[in-house]
């Protein structure tokens, strides 16, 4: 089985899913969350920073995976905040907005693949450290 980064890249690059959906489906596959195409429709609108360059869809997808895994924990909101900080640091950007992240990381041929793969890497490490 592929790791989280490979799964996310496959969904994003090979299957053409948006950033949020790619992370969600990769997380579902790797962590056995039982989510499918119908569930993924909930995150379609988060791609491209909700279509206006706002909050990064890869971050939104990551938070959704964390929610499925950890939402019953009392410290869930704190965990989310910690992941957002890790995401910012990992992508070396002072913002979580798609527009700013894309300006820094997007490439003409691969679009935001680098952001999606990095988000998946960060998410995998974060889950392992907080499980």
Where on the chain are the PLM-derived regions?
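Residue-level detector of well-ordered alpha-helical segments, enriched
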Residues: 19, 38, 42, 54-58, ...
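Short, small-residue alpha-helix embedded
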Residues: 58-68
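C-terminal binding/interaction regions
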Residues: 77, 81-131
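Active-site-proximal helix-loop elements at catalytic-domain edges
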Residues: 1-31
């Amino acid at each position: 089985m592929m790791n989280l980064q490979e799964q996310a890249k496959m969904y994003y690059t090979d299957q053409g899913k948006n950033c949020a959906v790619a992370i969600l489906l990769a997380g579902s596959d790797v962590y056995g969350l039982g989510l499918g195409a119908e569930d993924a429709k909930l995150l379609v609108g988060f791609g491209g920073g909700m279509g206006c360059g706002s909050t990064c869809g890869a971050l939104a997808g990551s938070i959704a995976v964390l929610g499925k895994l950890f939402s019953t924990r009392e410290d869930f909101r704190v965990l989310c905040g910690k992941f957002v900080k890790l995401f910012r640091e990992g992508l070396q950007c002072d913002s979580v907005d798609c527009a700013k992240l894309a300006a820094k990381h997007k490439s003409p041929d691969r679009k935001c693949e680098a952001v999606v793969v990095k988000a998946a890497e960060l998410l995998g490490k974060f889950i392992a450290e907080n499980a």
